[in-house]
Amino acid sequence: LIAERPGRIRLFREGRLSTYAELPVYHRGESGLLGLALHPRFPEAPYVYAYRTVAEGGLRNQVVRLRHLGERGVLDRVVLDGIPARPHGLHSGGRIAFGPDGMLYVTTGEVYERELAQDLASLGGKILRLTPEGEPAPGNPFLGRRGARPEVYSLGHRNPQGLAWHPKTGELFSSEHGPSGEQG
């Protein structure tokens, strides 16, 4: 599967490229369709997860789930909503991946509002950790903390764009990008 930022998901199979799904997105700057992940038990659990920016009902980022139906995907439900987005479309984060623990990890940017990255009541500037159903994952560090979003796994991020796990230790690595030197 290939994600295209304007909202199209393409299926490349046996040398052929076809449209798998088309999702409505707000596509400006770095926003749009930004990440895809297969359920860790795919195809037994026939779900594809996507991170997108939407404008309908208020501008925001969200994680949605599609049901895999052979050659196409059909929007099944919203897994997580209310991730900050701004009209400029910058610093939306948007990488999603299932970790070795079977949980869904979601990167979110601080949308050029640096204070969001340290605000535990905001989903912006974080790495989130969810169950495949979209609930806060057991063992998240801020579960039960008053005023904190229980989905938060890591905070203080500018615009994380990559996720990977060490193959032996399972340690999570996240990559971010930006200009060199002092960020002041």
Language-model regions, residue ranges each:
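A structural motif
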Residues: 97-105, 129-138
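Flexible glycine/proline-enriched surface loops and loop-helix/loop-strand junctions
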Residues: 109-113, 144-148, 156-159
